[in-house]
């Protein structure tokens, strides 16, 4: 917990009540290494995903629009990751100035909200495409998808404003280091608890409930369709993938959200124990690695479930250029979930079973 002291040379000077919290040699080695791995893998994977979706698949479906925007949001975040790697390797000494402190912090916040919102919209799109394919046709258009993505980027930018406003460079007098951190003028301020709860609720809880509901309804619809056509072999991979998508999202973000909430309690002075502060400050960068590494893999995780994406991705790796004219159908970001024309899965046993193509 930090307490305000004075201002000198434009940089606020503060005291740290728990100066040793989170400051361990293994953190200063492990975290920059993990950040570097995330940067290389993320830049490579997301850049290829953008090329495949835009140049090979020609951006023809709603799902491809969401997937492309997810990859672009990840790339925006990844470009700032070397700054955080250097910051941690220098034992939390920020050498890049106040401007980059704000931009890099806003990028982290922006990626969180943009990615989560895009995944939520994708789950709704998959629900409409599978459970209500005919009724949702007029709503599931490229124009609607693009407008939705613009709104998501605006909302994510709005949610990132607190990082630009309140994240600054501070000089900690009792440790003699300059840090890039959040600092609130009053311990009684409602601002930190408000920002923390916004991140917990808007950045995780509500999106998770929507994603869980969407895929649960998809699960039930597919299960019902299999029961109608009992003579058809059941593809259990479909249900495993639905379960994997939900669990992948949940376990990627839960640790980070929990420690974010604990960090808010420390900032407010509710938690005074430096031992707990040490646990939180030590665990926080690890949870960030888990959340954002999984986040940066999302375009590949979802894309590789589709035959078209996988095919063109491998072509790109072999330096095979895209054809001048493409008739490909990117079927999802979660990928090729297709539903054969019927909005009523139980209406007729003669109708084809809905299929979740996993290639």
UniProtKB/Swiss-Prot annotation:
The gene is AGTR1. Disulfide bonds join 18-274, 101-180. PANTHER family: CELL ADHESION MOLECULE (PTHR10489), TYPE-1 ANGIOTENSIN II RECEPTOR A (PTHR10489:SF956). It comes from the Eukaryota. Interacts with MAS1. Interacts with ARRB1. Interacts with FLNA (via filamin repeat 21); increases PKA-mediated phosphorylation of FLNA. Receptor for angiotensin II, a vasoconstricting peptide, which acts as a key regulator of blood pressure and sodium retention by the kidney. The activated receptor in turn couples to G-alpha proteins G(q) (GNAQ, GNA11, GNA14 or GNA15) and thus activates phospholipase C and increases the cytosolic Ca(2+) concentrations, which in turn triggers cellular responses such as stimulation of protein kinase C. It comes from Oryctolagus cuniculus. It holds the Pfam family 7tm_1. C-terminal Ser or Thr residues may be phosphorylated. The keyword Transmembrane helix applies. This is Type-1 angiotensin II receptor. It is a multi-pass membrane protein. It is found in: Cell membrane. Its main location: membrane. The keyword S-adenosyl-L-methionine does not apply. The chain crosses the membrane at residues 26-55, 62-89, 99-125, 142-165, 191-216, 240-268, 279-304. One of its GO terms (molecular function) is C-C chemokine binding. Angiotensin II binds at residues 15, 17, 167, 182-184, 199. Residues 1-25, 90-98, 166-190, 269-278 are extracellular. Keywords: Cell membrane, Disulfide bond, G-protein coupled receptor, Glycoprotein, Lipoprotein, Membrane, Palmitate, Phosphoprotein, Receptor, Transducer, Transmembrane, Transmembrane helix. A lipid is attached at residue 355 (S-palmitoyl cysteine). Residues 335-350 have a biased composition (Polar residues). Belongs to the G-protein coupled receptor 1 family. Glycans are attached at residues 4, 176, 188. Residues 56-61, 126-141, 217-239, 305-359 are cytoplasmic.
